[in-house]
Structure formats: structure tokens, C-alpha cells
């Protein structure tokens, strides 16, 4: 039977380069207690590729998770470029809503249009976070109008147009629901995420279905497949069937050596995970994006979004 995982929210962050996405995620991590007070935060937690740190762009989507009052919020970064079409779509299939981060002075930029369009097409609810609200030249009211115009241009539904706005200064560590609210902390953004973004749902007792949406690599364990559990429960040492994305007849029996969930900036080993969890599995040498981890008795693949090759010239 389908049930909701009320203790989880899976969100993607969409933002233009330099609109403060990484500072925002740093601040959410900091205020949810991931970093100790005296710990140096390497600014820009999400950009772990060197190219990305240098250019401030996100190519491989990154995963972090924060906890707020008993709810785990998995935060997935999205590539900001239309050049990464397939990846954007696959990342968005892992989440139940998005946070669009917009600079309070610059407003909505063309670069976010592509990812936002995909999110709206997938019928995902959007929270708009107007960031850098403390800039002297901030013009939040006009920026809201611009964002809503962009939504209309991208054929947003009435529900999507009725989205919540949150004003923030990630750098100063506060968010507000109304412009004249007190400057306290990030709680208004946490609350909006938990209350507005739906919980993931699935059938924990059904056969396992986990679509691999991204691949990570580690020299000790090799290829690591990352995705969201749509149905069923996955356990360490479980025998599963890996079904090939391009050829569902191609199936391979494999064993789950290690299973991880995300916590803060780390992958944490777990013995089992169930619906709604974003997990990483290791020990499968030839695992690829788009493969589905299924039960041996009932290997049903999840339809796969083909990846378009990156066209960005470095």
C-alpha cells in the first residue's frame, strides 16, 4: 500500500551562478547543526568539482541533507545549464519540489529558465527564495513580479503561480516570510520547505525499485550509484536484479555490498533504507545512470530519461 514518508522532504535547488545558492546551503547546514560553531566551513560546499569552484557553476549534481525538527531534508543541486538537459530531468525526478533562488537585485536570469521549465513541466511545487535581500539596491517587489511573469511565460499552473515567497540574506543567516519580519535565522525557510513540499510516497512492502540517477566514484569502492527508492526496502547484502536502462532484457544479478544515506555533507552507512530515501549503493562494478535496482523475482525497470551530452566548452 502506498504511504507517505512524512519524515523526509526531497528538494532540488535552482539558481543562477552567483545568486548565493551555495551560501544558502552552507547556512542551512550550519543552522541545522552540521557544523560546530568553531568549525571552518569551506565556503561553497556544493561545488566539489574543481572546474565548478573556479567558475561557480554546477555540473554534477550534489547531495546534502539537513535535519529540521525531526524531518530530514535532502537537498540536491541542479546543473544550471541547458547543456545538461538529461541530467536536470533525472535530478528533478528524485525530488518532490524545488527552491528557486533569485537575487533581490538582479532578478530571474535566463540561465535558470531551462531548469525551472523542466520543474514546472514535471508539476513540481516551487518555493521562491529572494536572496541577498540586504543589498542596498535590492528591489524585491519588482523581482517578485518578474518571477511571476517568467512562471506565466513557462506555462505554470494556477497552483504553481500561487507559490510561497521567502526573503533571505544567506550571508547574514536569516530568512523572512514578510519583508518587515524580524531578522532572526533560517527557520522561516525550513518551515516553508516542510509545510509546502509534499513528502515522498511509495509502497515500502512492494518489490524494490531504485532508479540510478547519478554516479559517483571512489577509488576504494569504485562506482557508486545514487538514486531515490520509489518502492520497497533495500538491505545490505541483499541480492537484487540490475536492469539495463537501454535494454530491459539485459538483467544482471548483483549484491548490495554497502548502502549509504546522506547526512550533512557525508555519506553514512546504513543497514537498510526504504521509500523516499535518497541512497548510494556500492559494490556493483558496471552500474550506470538509468539502471534500475529491482527485486530478483519481479525485475520491473523504471522508465529512464536519456542524458544529453554536455555541450559546454571548458
Segments predicted by a language model, with ranges:
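Structural and coupling elements of P-loop NTPases
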Residues: 1-314
Amino acid at each position: 500500500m502506498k504511504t507517505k514518508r512524512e519524515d523526509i522532504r526531497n528538494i532540488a535547488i535552482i539558481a543562477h551562478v552567483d545568486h548565493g545558492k551555495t551560501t544558502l546551503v552552507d547556512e542551512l547546514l550550519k543552522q541545522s547543526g552540521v557544523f560546530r560553531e568553531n568549525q571552518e566551513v569551506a565556503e561553497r560546499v556544493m561545488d566539489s568539482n574543481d572546474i565548478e569552484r573556479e567558475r561557480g557553476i554546477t555540473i554534477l549534481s550534489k547531495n546534502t541533507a539537513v535535519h529540521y525538527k525531526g524531518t530530514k531534508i535532502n537537498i540536491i543541486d541542479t546543473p544550471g545549464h541547458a547543456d545538461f538537459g538529461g541530467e536536470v530531468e533525472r535530478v528533478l525526478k528524485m525530488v518532490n519540489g524545488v527552491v528557486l533562488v533569485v537575487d533581490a537585485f538582479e532578478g530571474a536570469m535566463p540561465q535558470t529558465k531551462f531548469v525551472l521549465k523542466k520543474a514546472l513541466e514535471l508539476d513540481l511545487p516551487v518555493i521562491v527564495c529572494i536572496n541577498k535581500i540586504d543589498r542596498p539596491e535590492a528591489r524585491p517587489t519588482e523581482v517578485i513580479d518578474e518571477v511571476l511573469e517568467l512562471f506565466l511565460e513557462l506555462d505554470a499552473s494556477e497552483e504553481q503561480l500561487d507559490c510561497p515567497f521567502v526573503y533571505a540574506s544567506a550571508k547574514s543567516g536569516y530568512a523572512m516570510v514578510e519583508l518587515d519580519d524580524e531578522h532572526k535565522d533560517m527557520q522561516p525557510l525550513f518551515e516553508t520547505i516542510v509545510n509546502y513540499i509534499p513528502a515522498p510516497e511509495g509502497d515500502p512492502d512492494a518489490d524494490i525499485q531504485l532508479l540510478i540517477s547519478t554516479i559517483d566514484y571512489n577509488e576504494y569502492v569504485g562506482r557508486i550509484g545514487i538514486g531515490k527508492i520509489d518502492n520497497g526496502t533495500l538491505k545490505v547484502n541483499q541480492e537484487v536484479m540490475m536492469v539495463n536502462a537501454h535494454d530491459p532484457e539485459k538483467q544482471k544479478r548483483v549484491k548490495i555490498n554497502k548502502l549509504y544515506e546522506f547526512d550533512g555533507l557525508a555519506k553514512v552507512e546504513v543497514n537498510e533504507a526504504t521509500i523516499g530515501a535518497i541512497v548510494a549503493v556500492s559494490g556493483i562494478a558496471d552500474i550506470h545512470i538509468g539502471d534500475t535496482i529491482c527485486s530478483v523475482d519481479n525485475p520491473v525497470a523504471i522508465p529512464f530519461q536519456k542524458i544529453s551530452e554536455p555541450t559546454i566548452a571548458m
